[in-house]
Amino acid sequence: MGRFLLDSDIIIWHLRGREEVTEMLRDLQRFGVPGCSALSLLEVQLGVKKGEEERTNYFFEHLRVFDVNRQVASRAAQLIREHKGKGVTLDIPDALIASTCILHDLILVTFNRKHYPIKELNFYPVTIRS
């Protein structure tokens, strides 16, 4: 199994042809098949444009998709409560993705690190060249 969980933004950039992201995904495959949350699958498929369906479906067929189960939901709720107590709002989708990473010991691959102010998370160092 791959050690990486792809956030929705990474998947979208890849599917829209951002070569730097595609190269990064090729590099990550050396460690196994990356995964994504079922939530990311939903988010990406909601935004699919006409003509992108086949490529999108093919991409998801080659990822491990992690379900949002009871443990993931409970851990996400705990993260939201903990951060609310610190005056920080965590969005439900981000908390679910973060809890998936924490529970499965995965490294999150995202351009949106600011969405995940969670000390327990490990991030893959993603950069975009101008």
Q: Which residues are covered by each model-predicted region?
A:
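Short, well-structured N-terminal submotif of metal-dependent ribonuclease cores
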Residues: 1-36, 45-61, 129-130
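Generic structural signal for small/hydrophobic residues in well-ordered secondary structure
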Residues: 7-8, 44, 76, 101
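Acidic, PIN/NYN-like endoribonuclease modules and their adjacent C-terminal/linker elements
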Residues: 1-3, 98, 102-130
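Structured helix-beta-strand junction loops
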Residues: 30-31, 62-63, 86, 104, ...
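Alpha-helix capping/helix-boundary segments
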Residues: 10-11, 40, 72, 96-97, ...
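Active-site neighborhoods of divalent-metal-dependent phosphate/nucleic-acid chemistry enzymes
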Residues: 65-111
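General small-molecule cofactor/ligand-binding pocket signal
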Residues: 35, 66, 124-126
